[in-house]
């Protein structure tokens, strides 16, 4: 399951995966953020807040996740990954080579710093 919250007017999306991801998680996510992106052009930021990566429920969920990344990574200014997981903490180094977005890792204790960093990103103009 992927909990999500779109902070308005900042245009910051917060994602909190807490169970294996389903294809429906991404369908719900897209239906909420695509209208915002259509109106504003981009999201100012995306925060992934996770204790650990829960994986995918099945191959369909994996495909939906990859399609979401492919179709949205150029529409996000900054990505913060908030976690104490060693494995997830390494993802920004990998992601920097694959996506066109500023990526930064923050520990759990730096949650507010991560949010502040996202808010400092290029403001989205209507």
Residue ranges and their predicted role:
Residues 1-126:
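Amphipathic, Lys/Arg-enriched alpha-helical "gate/interface" segment within cytosolic domains
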């Amino acid at each position: 399951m992927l909990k999500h919250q779109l902070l308005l007017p900042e245009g910051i999306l917060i994602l909190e995966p807490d169970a294996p991801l389903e294809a429906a998680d991404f369908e719900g996510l897209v239906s909420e953020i695509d209208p915002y992106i259509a109106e504003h052009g981009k999201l100012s930021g995306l925060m992934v807040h996770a204790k650990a990566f829960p994986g995918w429920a099945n191959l369909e969920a994996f495909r939906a996740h990859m399609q979401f990344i492919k179709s949205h990574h150029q529409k996000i200014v900054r990505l913060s990954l908030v976690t104490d997981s060693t494995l997830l903490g390494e993802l920004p180094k990998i992601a920097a080579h694959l996506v066109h977005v500023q990526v930064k890792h923050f520990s759990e204790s730096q949650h507010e710093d991560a949010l502040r960093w996202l808010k400092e990103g290029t403001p989205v103009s209507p």
